[in-house]
Swiss-Prot record:
InterPro entries: ATP_synth_asu-like_sf (IPR023366), ATP_synth_asu_C (IPR000793), ATP_synth_asu_C_sf (IPR038376), ATP_synth_F1_a_nt-bd_dom (IPR033732), ATP_synth_F1_asu (IPR005294), ATPase_a/bsu_AS (IPR020003), ATPase_F1/V1/A1_a/bsu_N (IPR004100), ATPase_F1/V1/A1_a/bsu_N_sf (IPR036121). It is a peripheral membrane protein. Gene3D superfamilies: 2.40.30.20, ATP synthase alpha/beta chain, C-terminal domain, P-loop containing nucleotide triphosphate hydrolases. SUPFAM superfamilies: C-terminal domain of alpha and beta subunits of F1 ATP synthase, N-terminal domain of alpha and beta subunits of F1 ATP synthase, P-loop containing nucleoside triphosphate hydrolases. It catalyses: ATP + H2O + 4 H(+)(in) = ADP + phosphate + 5 H(+)(out). ATP binds at residues 169-176. This is ATP synthase subunit alpha. It comes from Limosilactobacillus fermentum (strain NBRC 3956 / LMG 18251) (Lactobacillus fermentum).
Length: 512
């Protein structure tokens, strides 16, 4: 049997035509140390800062320290299966998380993996967790209100869409409650909410998720949880992961509210990582770039220009203080980065004034431009009234001999403080707040006993919804107080039929 030369030649040519030259080049290194959520590896000379690295058991890490002889890596997962001598390879990518509508209503970890037992998250869109914040010309001034549903905030410390407003106070003073109530109040407001829980107990996060579900708020909320049992690197990246998820909606022209609860624990996690990586410690043992850690995160909150879709991301970072000390390192850093702060006072909280917001030290630097005109009118003198009352109340403790004018101001102050009280998970629509504060400002509460003030407010809201819904609608749609004397007439009619507790008791005795 003879084989023709032409056949051999054509076979070789066919094989050469079908040959695909696929060379896979991987830059790998060797783990030289592992422990406390951190690894060191040599042989990764070209690794980039923030690059995602993969260990041979499938766990990922992020390059943090680029040194002359090795790379410091923070491990984004369980480090118990990683051993000295293991291989680690470059991926050429920076850390990314899944984003999009598929995450709404879900509870995820900082890597975007489902932890709520409802199966995998089906989305093919991802975003890098680190992104340069929008520049000056890419932004628009804050001019639209974000209603929290909490009277004292919407009246005295208004928040605008795209603002960064710090919630600061000691532990157990109601910081998280304000954040959760604000999320609940965004129902039917076309607002996407992201709640980032950093370093909290898993039972606490579960309770907050159930609260959101109970009020129908989980449908438009993403919960990112890095619990206290997670490694420090996950606590550190959690806020950045939440911001990346929010940016997907913001650049799509949507409005986003993101809550970081709380950044004190993120700072502690970053301090832990930095000390293990042997970075030089600074004040309170925090690394030198702790300010940048928070500023680059909070600067990502913005209201975008119309050219970029006009979306917004409003940030409410939470900071925990020790014994009310706002002059500590992390609190002063975040106060200087944000556009204002809501300060919660422990003494007021334990005295029953809840929410325990200190009107004197709480401020909103840009939210006033976003406040509706009706609220501006009815809350104009509120801050001064509270300051005057607190001063007089402190003075009145030393003696009971007060003149009539001083006593009248004290009585009015007591009613003002009572009006500003609000129950847990009971946010109010802005039109209801306006009518309540209008009644306070126009002396409708002056002869109502302090114990009856909250009942007066509740019954007034029911009366207005039943008989004068048009006035509520007018305030909601126009943002202005109703024209004419319609509101005064409605309040007069309600006041005429309102019975104080004493009057009810007298009527009951008379019937018997």
């Amino acid at each position: 049997m003879s084989i023709k030369t032409e056949e051999i030649s054509s076979l070789i040519k066919k094989q050469l035509a079908n040959y695909q030259d696929q060379i896979s080049v991987e830059e790998t290194g060797t783990v030289t140390y592992v422990g406390d959520g951190v690894a060191r590896a040599d042989g990764l000379e070209n690794a980039m800062a923030g690059e995602l690295l993969e260990f041979e058991n499938g766990v990922y890490g992020m390059a943090q320290n680029l040194e002359s002889n090795d790379v410091g890596i923070v491990i984004l997962g369980d480090d118990t299966a990683i051993r000295e001598g293991d291989t680690v390879k470059r991926t050429g990518r920076i850390m990314e998380v899944p984003v999009g509508d598929a995450l709404l209503g879900r509870v995820v970890d900082p890597l975007g993996r489902s932890i709520d037992g409802l199966g995998d998250i089906k989305t093919d869109k991802t975003r890098p967790i680190e992104r340069k914040a929008p520049g000056v010309m890419e932004r628009k001034s804050v001019s639209q209100p974000l209603q929290t549903g909490i009277k004292v905030i919407d009246a005295l410390v208004p928040i605008g869409r795209g603002q960064r407003e710090l919630i600061i106070g000691d532990r157990k003073t109601g910081k998280t409650s304000i954040a959760i109530d604000t999320i609940i109040n965004q129902k039917d407001q076309d607002m996407i909410c992201i709640y980032v829980a950093i370093g909290q107990k898993e039972s606490t996060v579960r309770s907050q998720v159930e609260t959101l579900r109970k009020f129908g708020a989980l449908d438009y909320t993403i919960v990112v949880s890095a619990s206290a049992s997670n490694p420090a690197p996950l606590l550190y990246i959690a806020p950045y992961a939440g911001a990346a998820m929010g940016e997907e909606f913001m650049f799509g022209g949507r409005d986003v509210l993101i809550i970081y609860d709380d950044l004190s624990k993120q700072a502690d996690a970053y301090r832990e990582l930095s000390l293990i990586l042997r970075r030089p410690p600074g004040r309170e043992a925090y690394p030198g770039d702790i300010f940048y850690t928070h500023s680059r995160l909070l600067e990502r909150a913005a209201r975008l220009s119309d050219d970029l879709g006009g979306g917004s991301m409003t940030a409410l970072p939470v900071i925990q203080t020790q014994a009310g000390d706002v002059s500590a390192y992390i609190p002063t850093n975040v106060i200087s980065i944000t556009d204002g702060q809501i300060f919660l006072d422990a003494d007021s909280f334990y005295a029953g004034q809840r929410p325990a917001i200190d009107a004197g030290t709480s401020v909103s630097r840009v939210g006033g431009d976003a406040q509706i005109k009706a609220m501006k009118k009815v809350s104009g003198t509120l801050r001064l009234d509270i300051a005057s009352y607190n001063e007089l109340a402190a003075f009145a403790q030393f003696g009971s001999d007060l003149d009539a004018a001083t006593k009248a101001r004290l009585d009015r102050g007591e009613r003002t403080m009572e009006v500003l009280k609000q129950g847990l998970h009971a946010p109010q629509p802005v039109e209801q707040q306006v009518v309540t504060l209008y009644a306070l400002a126009h002396n409708y509460l002056d002869d109502v006993p302090v114990d009856d003030v909250l009942r007066f407010e509740s019954e007034l809201a029911t009366f207005m919804r039943s008989n004068h819904q048009d006035l509520y609608d007018s305030i909601k749609q126009s943002g202005q107080l109703p024209d004419g004397d319609g509101l005064d007439k409605a309040l007069d009619a309600f006041k005429a039929g309102f019975q104080t507790s004493d009057q009810k008791q007298d009527a009951s005795v008379a019937q018997n």
